[in-house]
Structures are given as structure tokens and as C-alpha cells.
């Protein structure tokens, strides 16, 4: 997909077109790609906040139900991450409901525009101890065992066929628990399953977790979901703590896997000699955002 086409795609979206289906058809593709998902969600930016403002009841019920999962686990949690944070409509309304509010709150999304909306939404909710950035679910710019509790809310959803890949990457960064709120294909009706297959939604998340030997401590239909044709399944995975590392700087370069440091308002890896920009407050930490800057830390004033 060429970036020159974005304005055409935006016009199709404005007229009510299904962007994911359009992009798949135009590329003769069976499954969703990262680029298709990014374009689709970037175009939708702002809609989730608008929906929650107009329909606060569902969000309140959903985040309350999610908070009960965290509170039931009851561990001391220093850090939390929402993968696929979107516009932070879940994260921002979940945090105040937690009995133990983490010191560090993280969230990332593939789409820059969604993260930009999320930043403002978190500010309006007066939740300020957050770090939101762009990132890739399959190449997360975070170190191993760096986040106490990692959770998703229909974020793995459009990645059918990549369930194992997603689980392995999520477990890599998880220190204690991974909480997955994703399409419950195994709990869905025949009609709902057919719809999930049409949209390219995941359907083998639980079986993938079992085949990988992960410690699934809970798996059931979640109490709250907005669409009966896309029921939410809950899966909680506990990570064996014996090999966990203590991580002080969780951010890593998605290419070299070396630590990132905030230098001159950008994130730089001294070992990898790559720099990642911060655009309007949003750190851009996708592989494609990397800029080669072998002399980034030079003292240019001495020229």
C-alpha cells in the first residue's frame, strides 16, 4: 500500500466504506496486514472517545468488570501496560477503579493518531503518570520481564493466524500476569463465528496458549461485551517468576533490542546508533520510525 493513496482511502472512510475490506480486496489479500490495521485504526481515531462520551454506561460496566480481575489477583503491581491502548478509553477509566494503582502506567498502539488522542484523554481524566507511545504488538519496544501486568482488550483481535506469535511476544515482556480480553471464538454462536472468520479475527488463542505450555489459570466468557456477534473471552496467564529479571529502564530499540535513552527530546540507542523521534508528545517506537544517527551524541557546538 502506497502512502500516496491515504487521501483516497480517507475519502472512502468518510463515505462509510469498510477500510479493512477495501484494502484487502485491492491487494487481493486473505488476511489483515500490519499496514492495513494501522491505516484503518488511524482513520478511526477520535471515534472511541466520542462514543464513550455519548454512551458512558457500557464503558463504566466494562472497566468495572476488568478492575475486578486486577483486584482479585491482588498482587503489588508497580507497572501496568495496555497493549493496543487505542484512545485510552479503557485504560483511563480502569486505573481509578484499581485497589493498587501502579506507579508506572504504559500503553502503546500501532496508530500514531490514536495515541495522540489517548494522551489528551488521559490528561482530561487527570491520570498523569503515564507513558504512551507507538509500538508493534509483534515487536514491542520493551525489555524482557519489564511490566508486572500486561493486558489487552480486543487488540490481538484482527491478527488471525498469528496467535502464537502474539502470545510469545506478550509473555516475553510480562513479569507476573498476562490478562487477555479478546474475541471468544470458542464461546461464540455459529453466526458469530462466521462473522469473526469473515473479518479475519483470531480464533485459536486459547489452544495456542495450551500448545505453548503457558500456565492458564482462568479461561471463560467475560461478563461484559458490547456485541453478541463478537463476545469477549477472558484468559489469565501466570508467568513463572523464578527467571524474572529486575528491569530499571524498560524501553528498548525494536531493531537492536538495546536500551533507549531520552536525549535531546528523542529516544536514542547508544549501542545501536538509531534515534526515534517524539512527534507532538508521542514517542514513535516502531521499526520504521528508526533514523540512522551515528553522530547523534556529538557536541556540534564545537564545529
Language-model region placement:
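N-terminal auxiliary segments of SAM/dcSAM-dependent transferases
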Residues: 1-34, 249-303
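Class I SAM-dependent methyltransferase Rossmann-like catalytic core
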Residues: 43-61
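Conserved alpha-helix/loop element of class I SAM-dependent methyltransferases that forms part
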Residues: 57-76
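Class I SAM-dependent methyltransferase SAM/SAH-binding core
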Residues: 87-138
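A conserved beta-strand element that flanks and buttresses the S-adenosyl-L-methionine
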Residues: 151
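A short, conserved alpha-helix within the catalytic core of class I
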Residues: 158-169
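Conserved beta-strand signature within the Rossmann-like core of class I S-adenosyl-L-methionine
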Residues: 175-185
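Short alpha-helix
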Residues: 196-215
Amino acid at each position: 500500500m502506497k502512502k500516496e493513496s491515504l487521501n483516497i482511502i480517507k475519502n472512502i472512510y468518510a463515505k462509510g466504506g469498510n477500510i479493512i475490506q477495501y484494502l484487502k480486496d485491492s491487494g487481493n489479500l486473505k488476511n489483515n496486514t500490519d499496514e492495513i490495521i494501522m491505516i484503518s485504526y488511524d482513520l478511526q481515531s477520535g471515534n472511541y472517545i466520542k462514543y464513550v462520551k455519548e454512551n458512558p454506561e457500557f464503558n463504566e460496566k466494562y472497566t468495572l468488570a476488568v478492575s475486578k480481575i486486577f483486584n482479585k489477583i491482588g498482587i503489588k503491581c508497580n507497572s501496568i501496560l495496555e497493549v493496543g491502548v487505542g484512545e485510552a478509553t479503557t485504560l483511563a477509566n480502569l486505573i481509578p477503579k484499581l485497589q493498587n494503582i501502579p506507579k508506572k502506567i504504559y500503553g502503546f498502539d500501532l496508530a500514531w493518531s490514536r495515541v495522540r488522542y489517548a494522551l489528551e484523554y488521559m490528561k482530561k481524566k487527570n491520570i498523569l503518570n503515564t507513558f504512551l507511545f507507538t509500538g508493534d504488538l509483534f515487536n514491542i519496544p520493551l525489555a524482557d520481564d519489564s511490566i508486572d501486568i500486561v493486558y489487552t482488550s480486543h487488540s490481538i483481535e484482527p491478527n488471525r493466524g498469528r496467535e502464537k506469535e502474539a502470545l510469545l511476544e506478550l509473555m516475553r515482556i510480562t513479569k507476573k500476569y498476562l490478562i487477555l480480553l479478546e474475541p471468544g471464538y470458542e464461546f461464540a454462536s455459529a453466526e458469530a463465528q462466521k462473522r469473526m472468520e469473515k473479518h479475519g479475527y483470531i480464533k485459536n488463542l486459547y489452544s495456542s496458549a495450551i500448545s505453548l505450555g503457558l500456565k492458564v489459570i482462568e479461561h471463560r466468557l467475560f461478563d461484559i461485551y458490547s456485541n453478541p456477534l463478537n463476545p469477549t473471552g477472558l484468559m489469565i496467564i501466570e508467568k513463572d517468576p523464578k527467571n524474572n529479571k529486575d528491569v530499571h529502564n524498560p524501553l528498548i530499540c525494536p531493531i537492536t533490542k538495546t536500551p533507549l535513552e531520552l536525549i535531546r527530546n528523542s529516544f536514542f540507542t547508544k549501542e545501536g546508533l538509531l534515534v526515534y523521534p517524539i512527534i507532538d508528545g508521542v514517542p514513535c517506537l516502531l521499526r520504521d520510525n528508526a533514523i540512522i544517527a551515528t553522530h547523534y551524541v556529538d557536541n556540534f557546538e564545537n564545529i
